[in-house]
Every structure is written in structure tokens, then in C-alpha cells.
Amino acid sequence: VPQGLPIRTPMCRQVHRRFSLWPALLAGFALAAGGLAAPAQAAGLCTAPWLHDGTRLRLDGNGKTPMIVEFTLHDINRDIVDGCEIGLHIHAKSGLVALGGRPIETVQDHRLMVDEAGVVTRVVSTNGRVFAQSEHADLVGTVSTAISGMFLYGAGLAPEAEMLPGDSYDSSFDFDVVSPRLGIAIGHLHAAHARVDVSEREIGPPQTIPTLAGPQACRPIRYTRTATLGVLQLGNETIEPAPTVAHVTDWYCPALSVVVRQEVEQHGETQVINVVDLQR
């Protein structure tokens, strides 16, 4: 990548506007992968029945930030004491309806290191590779994420359960900003301390809802999710976006061992994310 290129402030501002939801998606990737594939006490993730090569989960979200996200598991390694390794490939398309234009398309490849030796499970992805394309700029770089807490609702969700503890997700990312027209780096985007906090979760009684497998008795799990990106270094500019707060409901179906729907309320708008395909 060419070094010493001048940073054009107008371009950086344009990149910031266009990618305003991108860092939050990065910081929350583990939330989607963990919460929608099912969060739990130590021991459970590495022995989950759906954890094998070829498992695929596809999500479809509506609202002002429509998205299609597909997770694929590969190269599972259980030959590790008190843990396992998981290859995770993510392909996503998302965008802001108000901006129009080409959606943001991202490809992520992570190697998840799962440690189940402690009281809570810990999952770490170091320098996961990311490539993102949008109409005005591409991002090429890495993201690292550390997650501690629950990862399988099934293991901690007894029939009489009414509450579950919260979780935290810490991320950092480092990207070159590339001009699609010129094919060269025009800037750099760095965040050292992005964080997602999930409050204590309230569990409701089972309700029958439509799912990809037909009507199922599923339990609503409600909580507040706060995403903080910290200080972003965008070229020569320093940006500190305000934290974003969302009220989330996960619909977990015990018979399927998966969250089939997630409802996210933010700024008076509700986005519904459904599992539309599950192969395991």
C-alpha cells in the first residue's frame, strides 16, 4: 500500500458518512454469531450439535438498514484441551436506505479460539481478515474481538429461568481506506477500543411464532445493547461517535436450539432480523 499519500478531508468525511454503520456491525459481529446461533455456561459451545464443518446460517433483516448475512463454519478443531477452534466465514450485504446507492458488501474470515476452562466461556478472534466495498470507498484490514459470557441459550435456559446475566464484547479494527476508482489507499481508519455491552436479560414465557421450520414455541429474551466505538482515527481526523443504544428481543426456540428472530428497536424504529436458512 503506498505510504505518505495526502488525506483529503472531504473524502474522509464522505467515507465516514457512508460507513457510519460499518464499525458497529464489526463490533457486533460476535453478537450476531453468538446470539443468533444460540449465549451459556462454560462447556457447551464446543460440543454443540450444530458445531461442525459446513453449518450455515442465513439472516435477513428489514428496516432502514436492510441486510443479508450468511455465516459458514469450517475447519472445526476439537483436539484442544478445554476448548476448540472454529473457522467462521461471514458474507454480508447491508446499507442505509436514506443514502441509496450500492449497498455495503463485506467478507470476513475469522479463526475463533474458544476457551471453556473457566467459569465463563471466552472466545477470541485475532486479526480476522475483512474486505468491505461500498459506492465511494473500500475498507481492507483486520478486526480482533474478545467475548466473555454465555454462548448457548440452551445450556443456561431452564424452563423456570426468568433472568440471564449480561455479556461484553471488545473489538479493535484497523483498515486502509481504498479508492475503488484509483485502486490506491487514500486514508486509514483505526479504532482501538470498540465495545458492545449487553445488559441482564429478561426471559418471557413461551409463545408460538412462525419459523423456517413451521410454528414453534419460542421464548422472548429481552435486553439492552450498547455499542461504543470509542475514538476513531480516520486519516488525520479524530472522531468519537456517540454510543448507540438498542432494545433487543431474541426469540429462542428450544426445539431448534437457535434464535430464529431478533427484533432491534432503536431511535423509534424496529428492525426484524429473521433466520431464513439453516443447514447443519
Per-region residue spans from a language model:
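N-terminal secretory signal peptides that target proteins for export/translocation
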Residues: 1-18
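N-terminal compositionally biased, intrinsically disordered segments and leader/signal-like regions
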Residues: 8-10, 21, 25, 73, ...
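Hydrophobic alpha-helical context, especially transmembrane and signal-peptide helices
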Residues: 19-21, 26, 157, 204
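Bacterial N-terminal signal peptides
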Residues: 23-35
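Boundary at the C-terminal end of the N-terminal hydrophobic targeting segment
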Residues: 37-42
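Acidic, serine/threonine-rich low-complexity disordered tracts
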Residues: 43-127, 132-136, 180-280
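Extracellular-facing segments of soluble proteins and assemblies that are Gly/Ser/Thr-biased and enriched
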Residues: 123-193
